[in-house]
């Protein structure tokens, strides 16, 4: 039965008569409606849209994902038209079945208001064909709404209506319910469809092959032939590139995150209680989304900073082999602690147990902490630069999820290959031989041969809110801006105590 969009944004059935209108030579038509990512090329001059649906599969690591977008992500809704320049269109989004909410009523989602540059809850979204305000960059004092004038190919999109939105409700409780329902579905996805109609309720044709105008709404993304739009569950982080100007860095013009005091936040996150996977997305200086990695997340008992011991205490419940490939050898498991022995020998001038093989006790903190298993290597090209690292002589390849997001930001700002990490923490949150790495909130990196490169890397760690950067006192004494210098860091840079409060939590 034909439908229309009412004033509240709900879709309702039309009463007869609803006969077709005889078209003239200027058939007014909505040809296609689809969700998309923004794709910017030519050093920020050209903008295009990349469709995301079941007919245009998304990939991670060369493999198709079972979904087209993630619950909570920012996407664009693109409405392609013919002979409808400057006309206004209403659009609503609703579930294709009962999976997401238990019904198929129109969803209230977070619509991007170009004037305020904030996301606002909206059921019915109204947009004008040929208006590009959804593409605006971050506003300035002189121009609070931003601008899209830097795009030189907007004429290519003059017959499109463009909406920017986040695929989430305004309330955390509703988000959790939707996530639970998606997790319970056989496909672990929920399908969304779009209903569109002229705001003035005048006749319109729908679909690329339509030859008649009808006075009703059109439905898109509601069949396999059109493509389904499938939403899945993930925790995710969005990491925004900074713009280099000489030796300094400023916020990118497409970073819309809120301020943290006088500094704009550079990372946002959305935690999804129905997923144990965390996906990291980088946004370059033009606003392009770049997939970095998906990591498995666990929750383990947190550990206090390690304490050196002269011997392993009696009374261990059991012993276990430590992960091979690093200095740790044996874990001695106690009721409220893990004592690790290994091959690391203290310096002869160390204050505690000089020259001895190190024995470290990590007591339980009493609170679980989240950890992600980092990729063994990373090498992602971004505009002639790279986000890259490898590990060296360590199996400490687990990290606090927030800290890993910040590390990706550091690498994006540094922009060169050759960064080797000597580790974060193990999967049990201990960090042998380090005393100060439990819970994966610190990053160790080998010193780079090039002095300027090492200084740039250190500066990036400081810029990305690592509050305890420690450099050595011998060959590295020339490094500037470290928070502390210590002899036990003569062979590696320690970047720790990442400030998680610097991250924008979408539901806080």
What are these regions (language model features)?
Residues 95-119:
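Short aromatic-acidic-glycine turn motif
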Residues 64-80, 88-90:
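Contiguous beta-strand segments within globular domains
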Residues 274, 293, 299-420, 426:
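Active-site acidic/histidine clusters and adjacent loop/turn architecture
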Residues 3-69, 235-241:
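Short, compositionally biased P/S/T/A/G/V-rich stretches that sit at domain boundaries
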Residues 1-3, 7, 16, 137-138, ...:
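Short, aromatic- and glycine-rich surface loops/edge beta-strands on solvent-exposed regions
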Residues 7-28, 200-245:
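Short beta-strand elements
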Residues 427-449:
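Short, surface-exposed glycine/acidic/tryptophan-bearing loops
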Residues 240-272, 276-279, 283-288, 315, ...:
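Catalytic cores and adjacent binding grooves of peptidoglycan-active enzymes
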């Amino acid at each position: 039965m034909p439908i229309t969009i009412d004033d509240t944004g709900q879709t309702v059935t039309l009463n007869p008569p609803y006969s077709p209108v005889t078209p003239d030579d200027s058939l007014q038509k909505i040809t296609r409606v689809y969700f998309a990512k923004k794709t910017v090329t030519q050093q920020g001059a050209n903008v295009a849209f990349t469709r995301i649906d079941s007919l245009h599969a998304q990939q991670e690591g060369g493999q198709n994902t079972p979904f087209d977008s993630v619950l909570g992500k920012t996407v664009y809704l693109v409405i392609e038209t013919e002979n409808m320049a400057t006309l206004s269109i209403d659009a609503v989004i609703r579930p294709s079945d009962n999976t997401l909410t238990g019904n198929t009523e129109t969803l209230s989602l977070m619509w991007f208001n170009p004037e305020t540059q904030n996301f606002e809850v909206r059921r019915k979204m109204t947009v004008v064909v040929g208006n590009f305000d959804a593409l605006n960059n971050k506003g300035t004092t002189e121009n609070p709404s931003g601008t899209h004038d830097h795009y030189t190919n907007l004429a290519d999109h003059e017959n499109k209506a463009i909406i920017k939105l986040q695929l989430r409700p305004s309330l955390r409780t509703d988000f959790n319910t939707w996530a639970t329902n998606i997790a319970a579905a056989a496909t672990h996805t929920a399908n969304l469809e779009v209903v569109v109609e002229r705001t003035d309720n005048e006749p319109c044709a729908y679909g690329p092959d339509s030859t008649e105008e009808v006075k009703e709404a059109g439905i898109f993304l509601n069949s396999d032939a059109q493509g389904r739009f499938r939403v899945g569950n993930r925790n995710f982080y969005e990491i925004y590139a900074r713009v280099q100007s000489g030796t300094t860095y400023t916020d990118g013009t497409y970073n819309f995150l809120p301020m943290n005091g006088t500094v704009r936040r550079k990372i946002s996150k959305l935690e999804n209680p129905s997923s144990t996977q965390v996906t990291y997305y980088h946004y370059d200086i033009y606003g392009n989304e770049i997939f970095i990695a998906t990591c498995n997340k666990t929750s383990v008992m947190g550990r206090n900073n390690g304490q050196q011991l002269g011997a392993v205490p009696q009374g261990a419940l059991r012993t276990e082999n430590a992960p091979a490939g690093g200095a740790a050898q044996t874990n001695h498991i106690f009721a409220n602690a893990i004592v690790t022995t290994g091959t690391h020998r203290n310096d002869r001038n160390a204050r505690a147990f000089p020259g001895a093989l190190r024995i470290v006790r990590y007591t339980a903190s009493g609170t679980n902490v989240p950890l992600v298993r980092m990729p063994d290597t990373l090498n992602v090209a971004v505009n002639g630069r790279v986000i890259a690292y490898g590990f060296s002589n360590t199996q400490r390849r687990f990290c606090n999820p927030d800290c890993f997001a910040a590390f990706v930001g550091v690498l994006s700002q540094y922009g060169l290959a050759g960064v080797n990490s000597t580790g974060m923490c193990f999967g049990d949150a201990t960090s042998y031989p380090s005393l100060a790495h439990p819970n994966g909130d610190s990053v160790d990196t080998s010193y780079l041969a090039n002095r300027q490169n090492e200084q740039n890397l250190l500066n990036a760690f400081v810029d990305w809110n690592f509050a305890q950067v420690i450099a050595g006192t011998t060959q590295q004494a020339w490094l500037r801006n470290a928070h502390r210098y210590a002899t036990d860091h003569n062979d590696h840079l320690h970047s720790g105590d990442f400030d998680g409060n610097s991250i924008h939590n979408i539901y806080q």
